[in-house]
From Swiss-Prot:
<feature type="repeat" description="WD 3">
    <location>
        <begin position="111"/>
        <end position="153"/>
    </location>
</feature>
<dbReference type="Pfam" id="PF00400">
    <property type="entry name" value="WD40"/>
</dbReference>
<feature type="repeat" description="WD 4">
    <location>
        <begin position="155"/>
        <end position="194"/>
    </location>
</feature>
<comment type="similarity">
    <text>Belongs to the IFT172 family.</text>
</comment>
<keyword id="KW-0966">Cell projection</keyword>
<feature type="repeat" description="TPR 13">
    <location>
        <begin position="1586"/>
        <end position="1619"/>
    </location>
</feature>
<feature type="repeat" description="WD 5">
    <location>
        <begin position="198"/>
        <end position="238"/>
    </location>
</feature>
<dbReference type="Pfam" id="PF24762">
    <property type="entry name" value="TPR_IF140-IFT172"/>
</dbReference>
<keyword id="KW-0677">Repeat</keyword>
<dbReference type="GO" id="GO:0030992">
    <property type="term" value="C:intraciliary transport particle B"/>
</dbReference>
<feature type="repeat" description="TPR 1">
    <location>
        <begin position="597"/>
        <end position="628"/>
    </location>
</feature>
<dbReference type="GO" id="GO:0005737">
    <property type="term" value="C:cytoplasm"/>
</dbReference>
<feature type="repeat" description="TPR 7">
    <location>
        <begin position="988"/>
        <end position="1023"/>
    </location>
</feature>
<dbReference type="InterPro" id="IPR056157">
    <property type="entry name" value="TPR_IFT80_172_dom"/>
</dbReference>
<dbReference type="InterPro" id="IPR036322">
    <property type="entry name" value="WD40_repeat_dom_sf"/>
</dbReference>
<feature type="repeat" description="TPR 8">
    <location>
        <begin position="1048"/>
        <end position="1081"/>
    </location>
</feature>
<dbReference type="InterPro" id="IPR056168">
    <property type="entry name" value="TPR_IF140/IFT172/WDR19"/>
</dbReference>
């Protein structure tokens, strides 16, 4: 324990102001402190002052000289007791109990005869406060009556100096002035006697006295002594020899009682109890200088704080803890003692004290779901809920492997060692225990329901004993009695009790939802498919989802009344808030909610609380629906059960049960009258009880109540009113009523009037009037009763006519047995025999026959057996057949009822030919029972040796199977047998046996043995078999093995196999990849020679690098070659490394090549360094010059190669010339000493003035030449050089003014777009030049206008150019200008009707449209333009427009573009789209495209299952239909017969697939299966065989024809197995089942499987299932040929006997019989079909299956 100073909450005064008392409120919310100033200060839990109030004297007139001796808070923290020295104890109320507001008022006061010296308020005693007096008495103040009583008095009236209460509040000790410590015990039970006794006499006055886990006392002798509860001293600490310790003044235990603080002068000592040593220890002391004596001390009830007060009024607060611990950053654990921890939620600041009630040390704490506490001590387990602040502690001993479950907020579930423990939060015991291994939270439901209203407390648990048994346990029973056990036939996967524990909901693995009522012990199935279910929180309403329906049960007592809503998504939750209940449904994109009827939900809550008025108010506003009707009924029944008659009357009135409502109204009136007479509610009155018994149909109860009151007539009337005449007559007879006889006659009359002749006849029979009784029986249609009367009454001569009438009635009623008895009674044996046999009363018939007709006994025995067989009583029929000698019938009956022992015994006497059909079934029986030898014998006798072999194989008796096979099977059967056994042995990993079986089978099965050893990595065995049987594949086998061993890391073995395969290079590569160069070099040297070893050595050197690699290469003479190779491959680091290590003479060359590489990479700075290192500065300069980095180039030239300076300057100047930067270029040329280049630059640019200037300055010899060029006119207008445009214009205007128009024109024209960006200015100048030419220079007018026009068009002024041409009547030039500027309307207007101009304009316009890809405009122009538009659309991939335009151009164009479109889609792999294009837009029959068509067909039909597209198959069908028609109509069918037949096959295969898909969608399963069977004719190149047989087999299985499904799925499995083997073909597959069919036999095995492996396994299981079905013959269906009458495969288009050919049905593909043919033709091809199939198709679709045209049934 550590005490750390926290804060001072009251500062010290400058004078004496003793803190006389400190006390904490038990709820930790307040601290009260008082000093000698008589003011009580109130602080919050953190020590902040919140309030204060001044105390009062005992009497208002008394002087204010009292002091406060002690204070204590009440256990509920709302009151404060103050003991005062002026002979009184005041109780202050601090909190208003009604409003919770803070309010200080005196609620109790206890005046005494002398001064009050001390006070305590024991725990859990809110109305009892204990205080001590100066006269030695300890008194008890009772708050309820405001009186005080003496608990005990000191014999010598010794002053009470201290009081202390035990931790549990059941005891109080007091310390007295004479050193005695007394103990007072409160009575253990109410009314008991309290006791008191002297505990011990302390060594001094025990001013400091406390009681924790033991009693501690100290005083002025400086000793601290600890006593046990009997007063024996257990430990003491003596400080009498310590001068720094003075007398002890106060004592305070922490809430756990294991730590205590004693105050003394300027310090306080702390002591703790060591559990391990079972002793008290000093834990240290706190020195507080200038604090003076500690006058008061108090611990906070949670143990986290300790406060002390001083003589000067100071109050200090200390933080007390053993340790602190942060948990997951969300919680803080403060260990205030070893057995108490404060758990604080950091987010909310909420605190809870986790404390062991047994005082054990808390070792570990965990918090689950941020809410639930789990703590451990050595012997207990602590649990708590942070939200409700409820804690529990239970004894616990485990190894820590228990699992906790917190799904239920009321209880904690602990699963350990197969047992489930239920602990309710807030209780320190285990609520219940059960054994279960199924600890899924969805498989356990616990209900803890507190008492509400009249409803009692309920605690129940539902759990699984096993996965099919639910047990419901009552947790309130002493040992947990079982309320119900629910046995179910399917595994349960969810269960939950409702909140009251009256009903259990559970769901099984089949998604069936069940409701179990605990009261009625009844189970009801609510749903046959349920994917979500939940009780609505806080109610008995059930919400469930069944597929797309939301189901709600508002009343669990009426499970048939369900409310359903259609929904689209999945129910995810149920939310209740703001008086609204909503079901949340996730629809994928969004979430929606469905509101439930809140009124009906509230009704359930009201009924649960038995608040019937509220229940009625809830139901009254609602309409009467099935839900509300059920709830009215539920309320009525519950109201009747609790005698709420008015409520029940209202309920039945609401239900429309007027009779019950009126009856209850009478009962209510009776009860009201009884209440007035006798008091109470009147329901106990005998008349009310009798009526209620009558209502509940408790007739004996009602009768006894009426007879007890002497109400005989009322009792008789009661029975008469309810038509219980016999009870009425019984009452009348028993009471000797005067009207008893009349009552009987009245009863008989009533029976006759109501048609109850049977009852009337029974009355007459009892009276002895037999004739009347017989007449009544016959009248009532009861001839059997009449015959019974005749046979039971003897010595009566009955009228023969009467007897004949009875016999006729018996025959008419079918009572032949009774008629036979009557005939026998009348000694008419023949008629009796006939009646017995007609009524199947064979026992009586045989008895009669043995007496009268012995010869007929055998006949009747067989007849009896036949009849028993018809009644499915085969077991009983066996003996009758044996008795009659019908042996075959006896055997059949014995087998049918599985009496095989009897059948075997009977069959031995039969002829073998007769017994043959039964041998197989008997053999199968013996096989199932394990009698294999007997089974073998019967299989052999049944000529089914193959089945005997398979039986022994299944049983694992291989030798016996071989014995039977060798003795009875054919060669082919033996081979099939060996294959099957080999596969079985391989699966069992019996590889030697499997090898023998494969080799015994021979042929391709040898490859299976080889593959088996390969799969099992037994490579030696594999090579042995390959060498022995497949010598040509030995190298390939070695290579495969080597590759596998390489992957596995077995390199030595892999090398061996590579070498054996003559592939040593792969071995070398293998070793290189794993850096085993020695081995690689060894293999290369041994098998590849010197050159190979050199290559490996070079590669090795590269990996070694540095000197090692170079030395290796040098040693082998490959160093130079390696360097060159490294440079060429860009491995410069290796190249440098090798060069420096062994070939330094090549270093400059490597630097140069590396520099060139860096230059190409754009890394110029690095390249520069490498060029310099290579001694090539010129190349570095060239690099920078190339990149125009002149400064860098100049820097290198000046430093390394000055001869390059001039060249760099010239290059830079030329770049400036290209950029027209004349002056910089001139300066660079001059600097490079190349003035002639500067002169040439200006002359080329016609800048004559600058050229003349340069010549005069630098080249005087060139001055004359330049002047001559200028004077010759080449420089006209150009003398301005770089002058501005304004200068040129001014110069031209000057020429105009001087009438020098020629030079003016040249000057205007000298102005170009390079001189100015002002296009308006340019247009004006050029226009002025043209105008001058027009006006004054007519001879050059046209040239000038053309020049101006060209320039205007260059700057985009086409309209101005055209108008210029028009001004000189140059229409052609104007039109050209307008067309160039796209001014088509102006051009057309100018052209008028001139055809030449118009044609030119349209050509230009078309060229413009083409150049700008304006396809729509081109298309609208038609003709060849449309063709051009189509090509544009093709380029843009706008195929819809392509086909639309192409269709307008004719079918040939349409088919050509369809071909282009399809080709493009085919190349993109979109076979479906390609087929659709041809189907929709036409197809050409040119032979060069036939391969394309076939490839598209194969792409569609050979698609994998995931890529398969029924729409694509339909498009392919339409495409091939078009193609075949085009070929036939164009005469190509004969010319290209093979191709046409192939296309026809593709068409038919696609047609049947399309029809099958459509039929399947409409539920026409037989048509779908027939179509898919017809597809089988085209397996191989047309459609993959595995897909065809797979789909056909599944279709027949869905259609219910298992024999067809078995054969086809079995073929599919054979194909799948063949596909797993390399180089397999269909020829190796057994074809017996398809030998006489038109299904191809020899075809290519597909390379890619159509189905997944899981689907193949499903098919295997399905085939196995069908094979086990003995009712299936497991062969293809046959039919009789119409021509020859022989049986042939039902889908054959050609009879395999007579070769008769049949037309295929367009609906199914099946052959059409002549008598069943219908022909349909409607402006299309003639369609032949089977009548029934056609009608089924047309009724489903309304169209024919080929063209899709409207069609009608044909009968």
């Amino acid at each position: 324990m550590q005490l750390r100073y926290f804060k001072s909450i009251l500062p010290p005064a400058d004078q004496y102001q003793k803190i006389t008392s400190l006390t904490w409120a038990p709820n930790n919310s307040r601290l009260a402190a008082v000093s000698t100033d008589k003011v009580v200060y109130l602080f919050d839990e953190n020590g902040e002052k919140r309030d204060k109030f001044k105390t009062k004297a005992a009497e208002a007139n008394n002087p204010n000289t009292y002091i406060i001796r002690a204070m204590a808070f009440s256990p509920d923290s709302t009151k404060l007791a103050i003991a005062q020295s002026d002979n009184i104890v005041f109780i202050y109320r601090l909190v208003d109990p009604d409003t919770g507001a803070e309010k200080k008022s005196i609620c109790n006061k206890f005046p005494q005869a002398c001064a009050v010296t001390s006070l305590v308020w024991p725990k859990d005693r809110p109305n009892e406060v204990v205080f001590g007096l100066a006269d030695g008495k300890v008194r008890l103040g009772m708050l309820k009556n405001n009186k005080s009583y003496t608990c005990y008095a000191h014999p010598e009236n010794s002053y009470v100096v201290a009081l202390a209460s035990s931790l549990n509040g059941q005891n109080v000790i007091s310390g007295h002035m004479d050193g005695a410590i007394w103990k007072f015990n409160f009575p253990a039970e109410e009314g008991g006697t309290p006791t008191s006794s002297q505990l011990v006499v302390h060594s001094c006055v025990p001013y400091s006295l406390g009681w924790g886990s033991c009693i501690a006392a100290a005083g002025n002798d400086n000793r601290v002594v600890f006593y046990d509860l009997n007063g024996r001293e257990i430990r003491s600490f003596d400080y009498s020899n310590n001068d720094e310790v003075r007398e002890f003044t106060t004592c305070a235990f922490n809430p756990s009682g294991d730590t205590v603080v004693f105050g003394t002068y300027n310090r306080f000592y702390m002591y703790t109890f060591n559990i391990q040593r079972n002793d008290w220890e000093e834990a240290g002391h706190k020195q507080i200088d200038n604090f003076y004596a500690v006058s008061a001390a108090s611990w906070k009830p949670d143990g986290s704080k300790m406060t002390v007060g001083s003589m000067t009024g100071a109050v200090d607060m200390y933080d007390a803890c053993v340790k602190r611990h942060m948990y997951k950053g969300k919680f803080e654990f403060t260990y205030v003692s070893k057995s108490a921890v404060i758990v604080k939620t950091l987010k909310t600041g909420m605190r809870i004290v986790l404390k062991s009630v047994y005082g054990y040390e808390i070792e570990k704490i965990n918090i689950y779901h941020d809410r639930y506490l789990i703590a451990r001590t050595t012997y207990t387990l602590l649990m708590g809920d942070l939200d409700t602040c409820k804690l529990s502690e239970i004894p616990w001993d485990s190894d820590g492997s228990e699992k906790f479950h917190f799904e239920n907020e009321r209880v904690c579930m602990v699963h350990y060692a197969g047992e489930l423990h239920i602990v309710e939060y807030g209780r320190n015991d285990v609520l219940g225990t059960c054994r279960t291994e199924h600890m899924n939270p969805y498989l356990i439901s616990a209900v803890v329901q507190e008492a509400r209203g009249i409803a009692s407390e309920s605690k129940k648990l539902a759990y699984l004993i096993d996965l099919q048994t639910v047990r419901i346990q009552d947790l309130m029973a002493p040992v947990g009695s079982t309320l119900a056990t629910v046995n179910h036939d399917t595994k349960v996967d969810w269960l939950e009790l409702n909140q009251r524990g009256t009903h259990l909901l559970f769901r099984d693995k089949k998604r069936h939802l069940h409701l179990f009522s605990l009261s009625g012990q009844e189970r009801t199935t609510l749903l046959n498919y349920c994917q979500y279910v939940q009780w609505v929180p806080g109610s008995d309403v059930i919400v469930a989802q069944s597929r797309n329906n939301l189901c709600v049960w508002y009343s669990v007592n009426k499970p048939d009344n369900v409310t359903m809503f259609p929904i689209k998504g999945e129910v995810v939750d149920i939310e209740r808030h703001n008086h609204r209940t909503e079901v949340i449904v996730d629809e994928g994109i969004n979430t929606v909610s469905y509101a439930l009827d809140e009124a009906l939900i509230y009704f359930g809550a009201a009924l649960e609380d038995q608040d019937y008025e509220r229940a009625v108010q809830t139901l009254e506003p609602l309409e009467l629906t099935p839900e509300t009707e059920a709830q009215w009924m539920q309320l009525a029944e519950q109201a009747l059960a609790t005698n709420q008659l008015v409520i029940a009357e209202r309920c039945y009135a609401a239900l429309g049960d007027i009779a019950k409502s009126r009856f209850l109204h009478k009962v209510v009136k009776k009860a009201q009258q009884a209440a007035k007479e006798f008091g109470g509610d009147g329901t106990d009155a005998w008349s009310v009880r009798a009526m209620m018994a009558q209502l509940n149909k408790q007739w004996p109860v009602s009768e006894s109540l009426l007879l007890a009151q002497g109400k005989v007539d009322d009792a008789i009337t009661l029975y008469q009113d309810n038509h219980r005449w016999e009870d009425a007559i019984r009452v009348a007879d028993s009471t000797h009523h005067a009207n008893a006889a009349a009552l009987k006659q009245q009863y008989l009359t009533w029976l006759l009037e109501t048609g109850q002749e049977e009852q009337a006849g029974a009355v007459k029979e009892r009276e002895g009037d037999y004739l009347a009784a017989i007449g009544l029986y016959l009248k009532g249609g009861l001839p059997g009763r009449a015959a019974q009367v005749v046979m039971s009454v003897h010595n009566v001569n009955w009228d023969p006519a009467l007897l004949d009438s009875i016999l006729a009635s018996l025959a008419k009623a079918g009572l032949y047995e009774r008629a036979g008895e009557l005939y026998e009674h009348m000694s008419r044996s023949s008629e009796a025999m006939q009646s017995y046999r007609r009524g199947h009363a064979y026992r009586k018939a045989i008895d009669l026959a043995r007496r009268e007709f012995p010869a007929e006994v055998i006949i009747i025995e067989e007849e009896w057996g036949d009849w028993l067989v018809t009644q499915k009583q085969m077991d009983a029929a066996i003996n009758h057949f044996i008795e009659s000698g019908a042996t075959l019938k006896a055997i059949k009956a014995a087998i049918d009822c599985r009496q095989f022992a009897k059948a075997a015994g009977i069959i031995e006497v039969l002829d073998p030919r007769e017994a043959m059909p039964y041998f197989r079934r008997i053999a199968q029986h013996y096989e199932t029972t394990g009698a294999l030898e007997e089974a073998e014998r019967y299989y052999i006798r049944a000529d089914m040796a193959r089945d005997a072999v398979e039986m022994y194989s299944r049983a694992g008796k291989w030798e016996a199977a071989q014995r039977v096979a060798r003795g009875y099977l054919t060669e082919s059967e033996m081979r099939a047998f060996y294959r099957a056994k080999a596969a079985e042995f391989e699966a069992a990993h019996k590889l030697k046996e499997a090898e023998k079986a494969y080799l015994a089978a021979g042929g391709d099965d040898v490859d299976k043995a080889i593959a088996m050893y390969k799969r099992n990595k037994m490579y030696d065995q594999m090579i042995r078999l390959v060498t022995q049987y497949r010598k040509e594949k030995v190298p390939e086998a070695h290579t495969l093995i080597a590759q596998q061993l390489e992957v596995e890391g077995n390199l030595r073995e892999a090398e061996k196999h590579f070498v054996e395969a003559k592939d040593w290079k792969s071995a070398v590569q293998m070793y290189r990849q794993v850096n085993q160069w020695e081995d690689a070099l060894r293999v290369a040297k041994v098998y590849g020679g010197v050159n190979a070893s050199k290559q490996v050595a070079y590669a090795w050197a590269l990996t070694l690098g540095g000197d090692d690699g170079a030395q290796l290469l040098k040693k082998m003479g490959l160093l130079d070659h390696a360097i060159e190779y490294a440079v060429e491959s860009g491995a410069f680091a290796q190249a440098f490394e090798m060069t420096r290590a062994g070939a330094k003479h090549k270093l400059p060359e490597v630097h140069l090549k590396y520099a060139m590489f860096l230059e190409d990479e754009g890394r110029f700075a690095e390249a520069e360094a490498e060029f310099i290192s290579a001694g090539k500065p010129k190349e570095a300069c060239d690099m920078y010059m190339h990149n125009q980095d002149w400064d860098a180039a100049m820097r290198i030239a000046e430093r390394y190669d000055p001869t390059m300076v001039s060249e760099i300057l010239v290059s830079q100047a030329r770049v400036a010339v290209e950029r027209k930067q004349w002056l910089p270029a001139e300066g660079l040329f001059i600097k490079a000493k190349r003035p002639e280049a500067a002169l040439k630059m200006y002359r080329d640019a016609r800048m004559w003035n600058d050229a003349l200037r340069v010549a005069e300055q630098y080249l005087p010899t060139k001055v004359a030449e330049v002047q001559m060029e200028l004077l010759s006119g080449q420089g006209a207008g150009g003398g301005s050089g770089g002058a501005s445009a304004d200068a040129v214009i001014n110069k031209a205007r000057g020429f105009e003014r001087n009438n020098d128009y020629a030079r003016a024109i040249e000057t205007y024209l000298s102005l170009t777009a390079q001189d100015t960006s002002n296009q308006d200015q340019l247009e004006h100048c050029w226009g002025q030049a043209a105008q001058l030419a027009i006006n004054y220079q007519r001879h050059r007018m046209k040239d000038v206008v053309n020049t101006v026009s060209e320039r205007l068009q260059e700057i985009g002024r086409h309209q101005a150019a055209g108008e210029l041409h028009e001004s000189i009547d140059d229409a052609q030039g104007a039109i050209r200008a307008y067309c160039a500027g796209r001014l088509w309307d102006k051009a057309r207007t100018l052209a008028g009707t001139n055809p030449t101009f118009s044609r030119y304009i349209e050509d230009q316009y078309n060229n413009y449209l083409l150049q700008n890809q304006q396809a729509d405009e081109l298309a609208s122009r038609g003709g060849q333009h449309a063709q051009q538009a189509i090509e544009m659309y093709v380029a843009r991939d706008e195929w819809a427009k392509v086909h639309e335009l192409a269709a307008q151009q004719g079918p040939e164009v349409a088919s050509n573009y369809a071909l282009k479109h399809a080709e493009r889609r085919f190349k993109q792999g979109d076979y479906a789209q390609a087929a659709q294009v041809f189907a929709q837009h036409g197809i050409t029959a040119q032979p060069q495209y036939f391969e394309l068509y076939k490839s598209i067909a194969q792409g569609v039909l050979h698609a994998s299952q995931g890529d398969r597209n029924p729409v694509a198959e339909k498009s392919l069908r339409d495409m091939m239909y078009r193609l075949v028609n085009v070929l036939r109509s164009g005469g190509g069918a004969g010319k290209y017969k093979v191709d046409t037949d192939a296309f026809q096959n593709y068409y038919l295969a696609a047609h049947y697939l399309t029809c099958a898909a459509a039929a399947k969608e409409q539920g026409l399963k037989d048509i779908a299966a027939m179509n898919l069977t017809s597809v089988l004719r085209y397996v191989g190149p047309t459609i993959p065989a595995d897909r065809a047989f797979y789909e056909a087999g599944l279709a027949w299985y869905e259609a219910g024809r298992k024999n067809m499904a078995f054969v086809m799925l079995n073929r599919f499995l054979d194909l799948s197995d063949a596909m797993d083997e390399p180089d397999s073909s269909a020829a190796v597959i057994e074809n017996a089942d398809f030998s006489d069919t038109d299904i191809p036999y020899d075809f290519t095995i597909p390379e890619r499987a159509y189905c997944t492996e899981s689907q193949r396994e499903d098919v295997r299981n399905l085939v196995l299932e069908i094979s086990m079905d003995r009712s299936s013959d497991q062969s293809l269906a046959l039919k009789a040929c119409e021509h020859c009458g022989k049986p042939t495969y039902e889908a054959n288009l050609t009879c395999h006997f007579c070769k008769k050919k049949y037309d295929p049905c367009v609906v199914t593909g099946y052959p059409i019989q002549s008598y069943d043919r219908v022909v349909f033709k409607n402006n299309g091809p003639e369609l032949n079909a089977i009548r029934d199939m056609w009608n089924k198709w047309v009724e489903a679709f309304g169209t024919d299956p080929v063209t899709g045209m409207q069609a009608a049934p044909m009968y």
